Curated annotation (Swiss-Prot):
Pfam family, one: APH
Molecular function GO terms recorded: ATP binding; homoserine kinase activity
Known pathway: Amino-acid biosynthesis; L-threonine biosynthesis; L-threonine from L-aspartate: step 4/5
Known catalytic reactions: L-homoserine + ATP = O-phospho-L-homoserine + ADP + H(+)
Protein family membership: Belongs to the pseudomonas-type ThrB family.
Keywords: Amino-acid biosynthesis, ATP-binding, Kinase, Nucleotide-binding, Threonine biosynthesis, Transferase
InterPro entries, A to Z: Aminoglycoside_PTrfase, Homoserine_kinase_II, Kinase-like_dom_sf, Pseudomonas-type_ThrB
Protein name: Homoserine kinase
Coiled coil, from the record: none
Organism in which the protein naturally occurs: Parvibaculum lavamentivorans (strain DS-1 / DSM 13023 / NCIMB 13966)
UniProt record, GO biological process: threonine biosynthetic process
UniProt key word NADP: no
EC number: 2.7.1.39
């Protein structure tokens, strides 16, 4: 979450007057993340989050994101609840941008996840996948395997400038992924961005999931692969199979994986690593000088991609095929 748009006090007060959330006492911008402008609001009725959606989030897709959060809350998933204004609308406008207010979620993210955190994550991810089964709206994954080639082509020259020879390596990897990608796995609504900073804990217990603005319809096992990459590597680049086993076993206790999903896991993990490697490369190559948010380092996802390329079977993640 980041602050890109400053909001004049009088505009904010007029906007909040259309909601029944009490009188504003104080607010502050939140300088994290890369997508939207976010503010924490303190009113005499409680604490809330205000989000102004910047240009990377299409306004036409906001009903999906907000509707999904509302649906998941109704199904017992702990995530921010969109607050409706007095007209019953979840989406408004502020500072010439689409804007929404959501409930405040208690908890903090963990910087160094342990196996016990991965157990909590696996269980919550499976519950999310099952809870989204009857959600009526759908959103295509714009960053699926079919989108990686165009993304790569758009920054190929910059990739070789970043690391000579890397473009050729990624070109070959993309050919393999495109040819072998499984397209008939069980699918539905996935989070698609469940990094540790998007998962809150109180003590060792998971207290909620946030940041659903990459959520889409895709394979459930691909969402698992994203979590393998985001949660199961150490700072030195090594893979922690204990964390992976904890994550996967906890998931399967809630939603058992089909044999095809288990078999596809190494390829899905490669694809997940490729997706985040490419977006990080793109953001680094196209990073404006003096921009507020520092781009994330692509190298860690290159290391992860190369690791998964060497995984011969699901046993490499602690699963039996």
């Amino acid at each position: 979450m980041a602050v890109y748009t400053e909001v004049p006090d009088e505009e904010l007060e007029a906007f909040l007057a259309t909601y029944d959330i009490g009188t504003l006492m104080s607010y502050k911008g939140i300088a994290e993340g890369v997508e939207n402008s976010n503010f924490m609001l303190h009113t005499d009725a409680g604490t809330y989050f205000l989000t102004l959606y910047e240009k990377r989030v299409a306004e036409s897709e906001l009903p999906f994101f907000l509707g999904l959060m509302n649906h998941l809350v109704d199904r017992g998933i702990s995530c921010p609840t969109p607050i409706r204004n007095r007209k019953g609308e979840m989406l408004g406008r502020l500072a010439e941008r689409p804007a929404a207010i959501v409930s405040f979620l208690e908890g903090i993210s963990v910087r160094r996840p342990q196996p016990r955190h991965c157990v909590e994550l696996g269980r919550a991810l499976a519950q999310l996948h099952m809870a989204g089964a009857d959600f009526k709206l759908a959103r295509k994954n714009a960053l699926n395997v079919d989108g990686w080639g165009p993304l790569f082509d758009s920054c190929r020259d910059g990739i070789d400038a970043y690391q000579p020879g890397l473009a050729q390596e990624l070109d070959k990897e993309l050919a393999v992924l495109t040819r072998e990608w499984p397209r008939d796995l069980p699918h539905g609504v996935i989070h698609a961005d469940l990094f540790p900073d998007n998962v809150f804990f109180i003590g060792d217990r998971l207290s909620g999931l946030i940041d659903f603005y990459f959520a889409c319809n895709d394979a459930f096992a691909y969402d698992l692969a994203i979590c393998l990459n985001a949660w199961c590597f150490e700072a030195d680049g090594s893979f922690n199979i204990t964390k992976a086993r904890a994550l996967l076993q906890a998931y399967t206790q809630v939603r058992p994986l089909e044999p095809a999903e288990i078999h596809a896991l190494p390829l899905l993990a490669r694809g997940s690593a490729m997706r985040f490697l490419l977006t990080r490369l793109y953001d680094l190559i196209n990073h404006p000088p003096g921009a507020f948010v520092k781009p994330k380092d692509p190298k860690e996802y290159l290391t992860r991609l190369r690791f998964h390329r060497g995984v011969a079977s699901p046993a490499g993640y602690g699963l039996d095929a």
